[in-house]
């Protein structure tokens, strides 16, 4: 699967990876917190992680793991699912913490979905990752991505037939011709040492630090595109405004 993913990403665009992981964190409980800009950015993140000798697992919406064929592949690859509103959410969190302490790097998207901010800056997100970090003692490495949005349209809310797949296929084929830069930056670990699990307000404070670190790493990746992406995706709805958007 790793070889197939690397080949797919290499066909899709030009992978550019910056930053690295401190050697003393290898094998330690590690959370990778990334912005979410495209249906393809998980594949880009996997390929980038292999460049720095990491093999992370993703925390995904539980429904994905129940999709025929796709779900089986994801489960066999070690990815984890969580249904936030279901009774198994606590058990899923236990599995995540166990994987972290077994030395498995875990990727979580704090936003929980592809950003719909008009400028494609990170959305507000939720505190789940921050709570896991504080509760498990895991280190948090912010990951910033840019360019994968040019490789695949946002597409449709639901796919009920082959016509619904056309936006994904046509945008990807254009990407193969255009070869956009697929940029991934691994930032410095976020310092959460003064915060405590269960202390009122600390999960929110941790979340804010993580999101600001992701955004800080994103700024140089999208130099020349500070307001809105130069690439226009006609299928992506835009709502709200990112609270993390740089003001200067």
Predicted region positions:
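Short, basic, glycine/proline-bearing loop/turn elements
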Residues: 5, 76-83, 112-116
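Catalytic core of membrane glycerolipid acyltransferases/transacylases, capturing the structured
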Residues: 24-86
